Each structure stands twice: as C-alpha cells, then as structure tokens.
C-alpha cells in the first residue's frame, strides 16, 4: 500500500515531479563547496570555501533560477547526471535514494523542520567562507567528511 508512504519511498528518482525532486535537497550546502583534486591520486579533497551564490546561513543558493548565468560550471543535477559524478556529499538525499538508502531523521522531509539539517550539524552553517573572501583554496582544506 503506497498511499501511506511518502513519495521518496515509492518513486524512483526519474519518476518524481520537478517539485518532488527539488524538495529532496536538504539545504546542507555541501555540494556547493569547492573541492580540490590531488593531481597524482585523483582524490577529491574538501575545502570550507563556498560558491559565491551560496547563502551560508540557509544552505541554499541565493539565485537558484539564474545560477548558471553567474556560475557556468554549476551542475544541474538530474537522475542521469547523479550517476556520473562522485563528489556529492555522503548525506545527500539524491545519492542516498539512488543507492537504495533511506533519508536520515534530520532530513527536512522526514523531520518537517527546514532547520533540522543545521541543528544536526550536517550543513555548511558556521564553518565556511565565501569564495569571494577565501584566497587560495589550498589554504582552506578541511579534514571533514562531506
């Protein structure tokens, strides 16, 4: 009986409406942090440097609709693109659902509270800087799981 279950438990990612798809974003902001790639190993290393369009308090894009105008390299996430990238945070709802895992209790869709991602300490709030203020990314590497 699917009527009692939320959409993310009954639909594949490619079956979701645009509104359902967009609501999966928990607002952690971690996908909007710059990463550096080790030239020798190919390993991605996290920084605490956020895209200039990221509102570091809310974890949301300041101009989501026009973001690619200002940040051409910004990825438009789709079910197909999701499988082609390896840098999404381990807590990302898109990634979790694609891997057959449940959403965590702190996810706003589960908790009903958009602040729950921040209260759980899994967002960028409080430990990031804007790329406009950061300088060299190498000076902003963090030993933190994204």
Curated annotation (Swiss-Prot):
Family classification: Belongs to the UPF0260 family.
Upper taxonomic lineage: Bacteria, Pseudomonadati, Pseudomonadota, Alphaproteobacteria, Sphingomonadales
Cross-referenced HAMAP family: UPF0260
Organism: Rhizorhabdus wittichii (strain DSM 6014 / CCUG 31198 / JCM 15750 / NBRC 105917 / EY 4224 / RW1)
Residues forming coiled coils: none
Origin: domain of life: Bacteria
Protein name: UPF0260 protein Swit_2819
Pfam name, any one: CxxCxxCC
